[in-house]
Amino acid sequence: FLCFATLSTKAMADLTYKTYAGTGARPSFPGNGGSLTYPTVLSTGTVTSLNYNWGSGYVLDSGRGSSVIVNFYGYITIPDTGSQDIQFYLYADDGAYMKIDSTVVINDWNEQSPGMWNYISTDQTLTGGQTYYIDVWWYENGGGAALKLYWDQTGSVALVPSSAYSTTEPVVVSGITSSQTTKFNTIRNKAVNGNQIYITQTGDGNTLNILQDGDD
């Protein structure tokens, strides 16, 4: 028997961010159909997770502790396999907005004290092992600043781990080598006990089944 593997090449386990100058309470941003009043980017970079409580300090490297907007974006991979109903929670101060692919899952663009129960999504039916685009907007007008992303994926609420994030979509790479392909080409026309061997390819293109017509 020949063994074959499918390799998943994961990008850096981060999210990309951009910080912008804020414009007071409930500033306009692209997610709510508006545009940034001051679209000049203050800073850019990557973060390993959404787990911040800045208090009255500077938000990331924006040079601001208030009147600031941050857009975090990248990809999130759902663990395990099969269809899952997942709830997301944003612990945020002040407003927050979040999309998974093209679906808005949280939209609470308001002045609030931090608390993830104020920012909770409905159940999102997602597939384990699949990767989705994530887009989070957040702003701070004044006072304390915080942003953390949690999910309920197993029946309990937990911080989304950094391993779930990636800056670019992971690429699935075939583990079938040219040498293995040659071996297949060699054996596929041979007969076993006078019976023809058929080789079929199924699934994602990386799983190969060898079927013998006749004797099992």
Model-derived features with residue positions:
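Bacterial N-terminal signal peptides
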Residues: 1-6
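Extreme N-terminus of proteins, especially the signal/transit-peptide cleavage junction
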Residues: 10, 81-82, 190-194
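Acidic/polar, compositionally biased interaction segments
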Residues: 13-176
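Low-complexity repeat regions of mature extracellularly deployed or surface/particle-associated proteins
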Residues: 172-216
